[in-house]
Regions:
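Conserved class I S-adenosyl-L-methionine
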Residues: 47-106, 108-115
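A short glycine-rich, Lys/Arg-flanked "PGG" loop and its adjoining helix->strand segment in the class I
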Residues: 194-206
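SAM-dependent methyltransferase
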Residues: 209-277
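C-terminal lobe and adjacent flexible extensions of AdoMet/dcAdoMet transferase-like proteins
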Residues: 273-331
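A short acidic, Gly/Pro-enriched loop at the edge of an enzyme's catalytic core
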Residues: 168-176
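A short SAM/SAH-binding and catalytic strip from SAM-dependent methyltransferases
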Residues: 175-191
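Class I SAM-dependent methyltransferase SAM/SAH-binding core
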Residues: 120-166
Length: 331
């Protein structure tokens, strides 16, 4: 597998955004491009992933459960609409300072955002003063993230990388790695999950922390799906719900106000399974929160957030040096 560094400084400049019109269904979505590229060629010409506007699952979408599938799922038409699902303002209000507080309580400064998406957490952490490297496997997502950062006066440092070979793409060690937005669920094979966690572990300093989240698939598998759009996916005009669910696949359909529909094939990870994988990767302590709360009801939480410490002893020493106030922080 070859890794690519994306030049998002030129990925999709505003003047080169194609006019798009959804003309597909939930099985196959096509977006027509009505703007010709310049004679010199835009970056859409240079990067094949940024030219893709059609989701393609093959003859049987339910059988397509490969880890690399997300690159064909996050096509430009879907990525351009993704922030309608997120709703940055509502999401910022719902999660508050949770991630910022956790990182500060542990004395962390450098953060690798392993699942940048459209840049929500990279931007928030940069605005809070953290040194952030923004990583994603999708060139389209990184291009949108860079654009979102630029609109807010920030220049994101972006790298396109596969988690399974992360350390071939990045340099140095980091205080913290965040893998948010239910992104770990895109790994359909257990060996891929273990490899990704091993890469995260290796990229952290000796006292580093990993923050990884997931949907409450336990409740979904055992009792069915329900969502109040309180956290993460806060756009109240977008419908997100599984159209197929079994122990090995959660196929979600996303319906937007203009009737455009896209889908994602994900692996429904159970909470304790993820906790076990994290510990087996070498992390000494894993704390799990439900919807940003230390105390929660398993059946009511929409999302779980795992905070894993690489070295408990080192972090306890740090908290002791920072005084009693830091020890009272919920981390």
């Amino acid at each position: 597998m070859r890794l690519h560094v994306v030049d998002t400084h030129r990925a999709i400049p505003e003047k080169e955004h194609p006019a798009q019109r959804c003309v597909g269904t939930s099985k196959t979505v096509r977006v027509e491009n009505h703007e010709e590229t310049s004679k010199s060629g835009s970056s859409l010409d240079r990067n094949p992933e940024l030219q893709s506007f059609q989701q393609n699952y093959g003859e049987d979408p339910l059988a397509d459960r490969a880890t690399d599938l997300y690159r064909r799922e996050f096509v430009m038409g879907f990525v351009e609409k993704w922030d309608e699902l997120i709703d940055w303002d509502a999401r910022a209000e719902s999660e508050g300072q949770f991630f910022i507080d956790v990182l500060r309580a542990h004395g962390k400064a450098s953060v690798l955002d392993a699942a940048t998406g459209t840049g929500f957490h990279s931007v928030r952490l940069m605005e809070a003063g953290f040194d952030v490297i923004s990583v994603d496997g999708s060139a389209a997502m990184l291009a949108k993230a860079f654009e979102n950062g630029r609109k807010r006066g920030l220049i994101l440092k972006t790298v396109q990388s596969d988690w399974r070979e992360l350390n071939r793409s990045i340099h140095g060690k980091y205080d913290a790695i965040i893998c948010l937005g239910n992104s770990f669920t895109h790994l359909h094979d257990e060996q891929d999950r273990r490899k990704a966690l091993a890469e995260f572990y290796a990229a952290l300093r000796h006292d580093g922390i990993l923050i990884l989240d997931q949907r409450n698939y336990d409740e979904m598998l055992d009792h069915g799906f329900s969502s109040k759009h309180r956290y993460y996916y806060c756009g109240d005009r977008v419908t997100a719900a599984p159209e197929y669910l079994d122990d090995g696949l959660a196929r979600f359909k996303y319906t937007f106000p203009d009737a455009c529909e896209y889908t994602l094939n994900m692996f429904p990870l159970r909470k304790n399974y993820v906790r076990r994988l994290i510990r087996e990767a070498g992390f000494e302590l894993v704390r799990t929160y439900g919807d940003f709360q230390e105390t929660y009801h398993e059946s009511e939480a929409e999302f779980f957030i795992h905070v894993a410490e690489k070295s408990v002893t080192s972090n306890l020493r740090l908290l002791d040096r920072r005084g009693p106030a830091s020890r009272r922080t919920k981390v």
